[in-house]
Each structure stands twice: as structure tokens, then as C-alpha cells.
Design a protein with these regions (language model features):
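Macromolecular interaction modules
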Residues: 1-108
Length: 108
């Protein structure tokens, strides 16, 4: 399983970021073929004197590296990537890696 993590920097307008992400970007991302899972979070700063460099984090899961690459090159993947310029005013850093499970997560 491959996890693609998108780290979004602090946006110029957080309310506009939230609105666009929820109403447009998440809808586009959910259409990416081969997507096995998709979760997001807003990280809290662990030290109040040092705010988090990231406003928002998205994790997308794919079966393997080839599936992720194919998904990102698909029309749906390209649409989601192209949408970043419409709301990610604080920048977006993408990293990917093989998932190692030490203790399974249970949502719900």
C-alpha cells in the first residue's frame, strides 16, 4: 500500500481554502481511479509558541506505486493536481511512501 501525503502550507485566506477544498477539491480527488482510501486532518501545533507550518494534510492510499503513478497521470488525477493553484496559496508539498502498519487504525 502506498500513501501519498499532501502537506498544505498556511493559506492566505483559511476560510476560502476550507470552502474550496470541501466543495471542489475533495470532490475531484475522490474521483481519482484506484484510490483505496482518503483521509484529511488539520494539524495542531504541539508547541503554542510555534504554529504548525502546515494548515491541512491529506493522505491518499493506492495499492502500489504503479497504481499511484497511473492515478496521478489519469484525467481525474490531472484535474485534481491542476486545481491546487485555485486554493493552495500557502503551497503544497507531496510525498509518498510504502505504508508500514505497526498497529491497525480503526475509524468509527
Amino acid at each position: 500500500m502506498i500513501q501519498l501525503t499532501v502537506l498544505y502550507g498556511q493559506p492566505h485566506d483559511p476560510a476560502a481554502f476550507d470552502r474550496h477544498y470541501q466543495q471542489t477539491h475533495a470532490v475531484l480527488a475522490q474521483k481519482i481511479p484506484g484510490l483505496k482510501g482518503y483521509v484529511t486532518n488539520k494539524p495542531a501545533a504541539l508547541n503554542p509558541q510555534e504554529p504548525s507550518p502546515y494548515y491541512f494534510i491529506a493522505d491518499l492510499y493506492f495499492e502500489n506505486l504503479a497504481a499511484m503513478q497511473a492515478a496521478l497521470q489519469s484525467p481525474e488525477g490531472q484535474a485534481a493536481a491542476g486545481d491546487l493553484q485555485n486554493f493552495a496559496t500557502g503551497g503544497a508539498t507531496l510525498v509518498a511512501g510504502e505504508v508500514q502498519v505497526y498497529h491497525p487504525v480503526s475509524f468509527g
